[in-house]
Design a protein with these regions (language model features):
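Hydrophobic packing positions characteristic
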Residues: 1-227, 232
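Long terminal segments
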Residues: 232-269
Length: 269
């Protein structure tokens, strides 16, 4: 069996912070420089490159360049979509494809003293078959970004799921939102001390600091069931069209009890 044409080339030192979501870095192949001394910026490396011509015959060429290489992320981390946000002076492993000038890189050490803000995206295919590439609408994915200050988890519904869901944490603004695709959502607004539950029907429960508001639209039912229900408050006001209180024993206790109305009917048996 022939050996792979993609093979380890050198341990490298990252020369500049990787830009944004790019897969490319500028790197110095440190193991190739052990014979050099002096200013590295003035050093040159000679590369032997075998490139096929238009007839497929390999021609050997010699290329001279500086100690800086441009390498592409080798994408060896399973479901990770975005390249690691390597910083200047981090260590990476450089690969070279055959005798070409194609170089690739991957991380191989943990260097927490060098790594800073990151943006990481993982995706998991939700396509049942076929040869099409999956995307954000046909995969389950999550994103953690200390650079953009958010965490986002998403499920798609392309494979017969009835609904899709999103969970978003915005650490810059201080809120958490859970939503589905039919307009149900739960929001925790830590900054303003508000917790809100919104139903697709328009019904709503909101806890705003010390105030609790329940909104029922469309004349539906609000039902409370329990062994004992106790309400302790300074004032209790009912504004209703019709009110019915039913029980085997009903007691009204107070310094004074007042009933006002056009008609007051009492049936004591």
């Amino acid at each position: 069996m022939e050996n792979s044409l993609l093979r380890p080339y050198s341990i490298g030192i990252v020369l500049e912070d990787k830009e944004g979501d790019s897969d490319m870095i500028k790197v110095m192949p440190s193991e190739q420089l052990s014979m050099f001394s002096g200013n590295l910026n003035e050093q040159k490396l000679n590369y032997e490159v075998n490139v096929p011509d238009s007839q497929g015959i390999k021609r050997e060429s010699h290329v001279e360049g500086g100690v800086e290489l441009v390498a592409k992320w080798i994408f060896s981390s399973g479901n990770r979509v975005t390249a690691p946000n390597v910083k200047k002076n981090e260590s990476v492993l450089i690969y070279r494809f055959a005798d070409t000038d194609e170089f690739y890189w991957e991380t191989f050490m943990r260097e927490p003293s060098l790594r800073r803000r990151e943006h990481v995206h993982y995706a998991f295919s939700n396509l049942p078959n076929g040869i099409n590439s999956y995307d954000k609408n046909s995969s389950y994915w999550f994103e953690i970004s200390t650079r953009e200050k958010h965490v986002h988890l998403h499920t798609s519904k392309n494979d017969e799921e009835p609904f899709e869901y999103d969970l978003r944490i915005n650490t810059r603004e201080g809120n958490l939102v859970i939503t589905d695709d039919i307009n149900d959502n739960i929001t925790i607004d830590s900054k303003n001390r508000i917790i809100t539950i919104n139903h697709a029907s328009g019904n709503k429960i909101e806890i705003n600091d010390n105030d609790i508001t329940m909104t029922n639209v469309g004349g539906s039912v609000i039902s409370m069931t329990g062994g004992d229900i106790t309400i302790n408050c300074s004032n209790l006001n009912f504004n209703v069209s019709n009110a019915t209180i039913t029980g085997s024993n009903i007691q009204l206790n107070g310094g004074s009890v007042t009933a006002n109305g056009e008609d007051l009917n009492t049936d004591l048996t």
